[in-house]
Amino acid sequence: MSDIDQLNSSLLAEIAAANDEAALEAVRVSALGKKGSVSELLKTLGSMTPEERQTRGAAINALKNAVTDAVAERRSVLKVAAVNARLKAETVDVSLPVRSSPAERGRIHPISQIVDEITAIFADMGFSIAEGPDIETDYYNFTALNFPEGHPAREMHDTFFFNPDENGERKVLRTHTSPVQVRTMEAQQPPIRIIIPGKTYRQDSDATHSPMFHQVEGLVIDKKANVANIRWVLEEFCKTFFEVDSVTMRFRPSFFPFTEPSFEVDIQCDRSGPIVKFGEGTDWMEILGCGMVHPNVLRYGGLDPDEYQGFAWGMGLDRIAMLKYGMPDLRDFFNADVRWMTHYGFRPLDMPTLFGGLSA
């Protein structure tokens, strides 16, 4: 084997053994640098005879090309290996649950989740959100909603009253979110399409009642609103909220001072197991009350009942949360028990949408 062949074998072996780009560069310099072994051989070409250049000169040039190609190929392999090693070391599994991150271990309270779900549903129908004060006057909480003097709801045992002010007027913790309906009618002209989620207060406390609880009410005012519209809106809401393909509902005549006619709405369900299933079964469960807005309430809101009419409905957010997600005791909602929140709460980034799923 000639000295050129030996050098070729030696250099190719060193190139193949280089484990990183620094080692490879050292081999390249030792072969092709100014004082490299291949460069030294190239310097001898000038002193060769024409015959030697055809044989030995060609072999030296072939050696140079072989070393150059081998270095380039090895460099490419090392770059790919380096990238793969970095990816392996720095990979973040985006499929891991959010709760694995310390910053994301909190939970969204079921009531906040329910409000977001209901907002998503009614926003898709063209409704906006209205809000009002928790501390109300007797006028907005009772009088403007057609509660007559002497109505049981005005009694101390049912409502939280503040001490009378210097004018003898007593304010109350609102017993429903309905005062916002009157305030909205006073503030804007029809058509009106709003939902009103918020806190309400009544003197009641047991497994299914709390002195402070949450309601959502809806109000539609225009010139042609009717009972058929109520049925459609509530049926679409129930199907979407309980995430079922269809629901069977029944409207039972009832009485509320602020609506006429008034209805209690039941939804068909299956109560044979530990969890209530909607969209199937032969049982019935009351979920909300509704009706056509009473003409007197329209008048208190500054609207002419001969020109405008509307419908309204209301339901307890805490109760429908219990029905949908299976919480057994309403009082647990307000105990700030981290274990309960971990079990029933929702991940912070799982915002409910109609497209992505309400409770996904």
From Swiss-Prot:
Its EC number is 6.1.1.20. It is found in: Cytoplasm. This is Phenylalanine--tRNA ligase alpha subunit. The keyword rRNA processing does not apply. Keywords: Aminoacyl-tRNA synthetase, ATP-binding, Cytoplasm, Ligase, Magnesium, Metal-binding, Nucleotide-binding, Protein biosynthesis. Mg(2+) binds at residue 260. One of its GO terms (molecular function) is magnesium ion binding. Belongs to the class-II aminoacyl-tRNA synthetase family. Phe-tRNA synthetase alpha subunit type 1 subfamily. Binds 2 magnesium ions per tetramer. Its main location: cytoplasm. The lineage of its organism: Bacteria, Pseudomonadati, Pseudomonadota, Alphaproteobacteria, Hyphomicrobiales. GO terms for biological process: phenylalanyl-tRNA aminoacylation. Tetramer of two alpha and two beta subunits. It catalyses: tRNA(Phe) + L-phenylalanine + ATP = L-phenylalanyl-tRNA(Phe) + AMP + diphosphate + H(+). It is an enzyme of class 6 (ligase). InterPro entries: aa-tRNA-synth_II, aa-tRNA-synth_II/BPL/LPL, Phe-tRNA-synth_IIc_asu, Phe-tRNA_ligase_II_N, Phe_tRNA_ligase_alpha1_bac, Phenylalanyl-tRNA_Synthase, tRNA-bd_arm. Its cofactor is Mg(2+). It comes from Rhizobium etli (strain ATCC 51251 / DSM 11541 / JCM 21823 / NBRC 15573 / CFN 42). GO terms for cellular component: cytoplasm. SUPFAM superfamilies: Class II aaRS and biotin synthetases, tRNA-binding arm.
